[in-house]
């Protein structure tokens, strides 16, 4: 189970390095899936806005405020993502949910 981000499916100015790492997780996961099948299931969860400590590590004041406001208004919880992971891995071994994009309903 690999955790990526909705940023692995979109491109935004000022987000190039982060987006590149998330796009990379998707490609790496698909390669692993093909290399390790049929014995290993490889899955990617791509969360949107999740309430985490991320804003605590942002040093640019305007960006920090924007992220905090965005998360406060619409973020889902880490527990929500854990439930999705539990669902994905509980599927029968004969199937794999390769990619799951999970966003708050109100996230653009």
For each feature predicted by the language model, list its residue ranges.
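C-terminal helical subdomain
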Residues: 44-45, 64-107
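A glycine/serine/threonine-rich, flexible loop-to-helix segment
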Residues: 49-69
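Active-site helix of classical SDR
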Residues: 21
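Active-site loop immediately N-terminal to the catalytic Tyr-X3-Lys motif
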Residues: 10-16
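Conserved SDR Rossmann-fold cofactor-binding beta-strand/turn motif
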Residues: 41-51
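Alpha-helical segment proximal to the catalytic Tyr-Lys
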Residues: 33-38
